[in-house]
Amino acid sequence: MLLTAPLLVLCLLAALAIFARRGLSLYPRNAVGFLHPSAAAGGGGERVLWVAIDSIQKDDIKNGIDRLYVLYCTQTSGKSDDGRCEPPQEYLARVVQKQFHITLPRPIKVVHLRSSMTKWLDGGRYPFLTLLLQVVCGSILLFYESCVVNTMTPTVIESVGIPGVYPLLSIFAGSRIVAYTHYPIITPVMTQRVENGEMRYNNKGAVARHGVLRKAKVLYYKLFAHIYRWMGKFPDLVMTNSTWTKGHIQQLWGHDVPVLVYPPCAVSHFMPLRKLPHQRINTVVSVGQFRPEKNHMLQLQSFALALPRLPTDAKLIMIGGARNEEDKQRAEAVKVEAQRLGIADRVDVRVGAPFSEVSESLAQCCIGLHTMEDEHFGIVLVEYIACGCIPLGHRSGGVCLDIITSPNVGFLAATAEEYADCMAEIFRIKNDEPETYRKFQECGMATIARFSDESFGEKLTASLRRHLPS
């Protein structure tokens, strides 16, 4: 009787593996899958996905390879411009063309995943033990939906960052896994901040102040780091989007050489909008969702400190999206803080501005502002440079390691005082030394050439050749 339960579990796991592996025989050996539940969203991660598919297809065409491409994503539907209800696949193609100006050269098969399963990947659904429950529960349900309810391809590219699904795909589905990692879920720095009792958006005051709770959270983080390290052993190829992410993944997962593949940035869209220094107005523009880690309050404090040294018509324009009610409340809190600081008439908060408005604001501003600490890459800084404004970013993460790597490209800061000094200096350069401002623009353009769609495609396909059967 003692052996019955373990034996039953082993039999169930074996049956699951046999069933989940049926995709190995149902799909061609060289079929490739793309596991990206939020494929219809318009973020930077989705741009990576669609440029990746486009690049792989073009490389296959160039080399005469016939391949099946399968996208696993949450089912979406909508209406066309004329009000007609569109089939999900037609709607997806239209959205991608509209958002990213991409029309794939070959068709793809779309496997629709039920939102009732993929919604559990959202960390907001877990009020406590968020990291652990999001990764474990979300990954199990994603595996069930993609490999048990549906069938998985022999090779799968996971481009969101759902590490819990790696061991399931490898052990049960038998798939080769390629992971494109945007950022590590946990880092030693996060654990250290909890140990030090630092209050952060992910370390509330009650935990930071209470010794026992703080020690419990440190233990939880360290336990999760070990689980995360184990999950990272399963991908056959790991690619990262920045030097900062590469260093952390190498340390956490033990991969000897994660491949650095910078994300594709739409630099060609912004370049025609660029204006010369004398055509630019005295504005500081910040672009970023109203999430806590974006640190909009630091932007207000810095601007308030700098104002006495800025032109009399200088303004701070804060543009961002609001994912939910909490983000909307944060945007309102920014307005309240601007009022408290006495700079409300010099601050313009715009929630959900259209892309055309964002582009126009960046094309004519003086400074592109960024204040997020440990940003894994910082694609918005690339967009600032492409638009011709001087970037002012946080001295951390991929921002300083990959983008503003030279004082000839932009400025870096960490405190409100440093940001204020940099703002004053950039405005001085624009208004008193336009030729110096032009040199910043030229150096910036030379720097961001490596972040183009073409550079991404070349590095991606070269890295994949050993892992994608022809």
Regions found by a protein language model. Give the residues of each.
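Conserved donor-binding/catalytic core segment of Leloir-type glycosyltransferases
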Residues: 34, 239, 274-294, 300-305, ...
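A conserved mid-protein helix/loop that constitutes part of the nucleotide-sugar donor-binding site
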Residues: 43-51, 282, 291-307, 329-332
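Nucleotide-activated donor-binding/catalytic signature segment of Leloir-type glycosyltransferases, i.e.
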Residues: 104, 331-356
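Membrane-proximal helix-turn-helix segments that form the acceptor-binding/catalytic region
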Residues: 197-238, 246, 251
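Aromatic "clamp/platform" in nucleotide-sugar-dependent glycosyltransferases that forms part
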Residues: 373
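Short hydrophobic beta-strand element within catalytic cores of glycosyltransferases
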Residues: 386, 390-394, 404
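Conserved acidic donor-binding segment of nucleotide-sugar-dependent glycosyltransferases
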Residues: 406-417, 425-432
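A charged, aromatic-enriched C-terminal amphipathic alpha-helix characteristic of glycosyltransferases
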Residues: 431-470
